[in-house]
């Protein structure tokens, strides 16, 4: 498995001329401090910038997690098991010869009550060294057309504080606005789902970290 892989599709020149770049690196998410945002701005510009055309919208969300980035990344990188921390996923199926690398796919079944039943998703980016991953929705029964997402995991450390190491997770997306919906409605729905997922990710990985610390303490004794 390669540490860093990515792929992209060519963009039509006429379409490209009508697009504008997102400015997520200039707008601080509400869950970040100014110091965190300053340190993350370069990564946001690099990994969380999209080209927007008519009928498209995008957003960036952040989650602070009181656990080391290695622990958080061990969960986030599992393209084959999104249900570990993602709400509303009933099951995820991959092929028998599945290998986690750019281009692999998963078939996700969504719980009832959402405007979706199934989703086929493709791994677009996986960089274990920089802790970056991304996927796009390529098919299925849902309303999120041309959905593309990137998630990055970032380490923070302050020696003078008791809790020296923590993690910030950034997740962004770009998607078509469904017919009959506004950009605001589309962002509200997608943001809510992602925010719930990130909160669950924090809960799970913080518990993992506590268990690791307890085990280490027991061994020391």
From Swiss-Prot:
Q: Which GO terms of the cellular component aspect does the record hold?
A: cytoplasm; nucleus; plasma membrane; plastid; protein phosphatase inhibitor complex
Residues forming the motif Latch loop are 142-144
Keyword Cell cycle: yes or no?
no
**Changing residue 178 to A: what effect?**
Normal affinity for ABI1
Q: Please list the residue ranges that the record marks as compositionally biased, kind Low complexity.
A: 1-11
- Quote the annotated effect of residue 115 to A: Reduced affinity for ABI1
Domain note: Upon interaction with ABA, the 'latch' and 'gate' loops change in conformation leading to a tight dimerization and the creation a surface that enables the receptor to dock into and inhibit the PP2C active site.
Q: What is this protein called?
A: Abscisic acid receptor PYL1
Q: Which organism is it from?
A: Arabidopsis thaliana
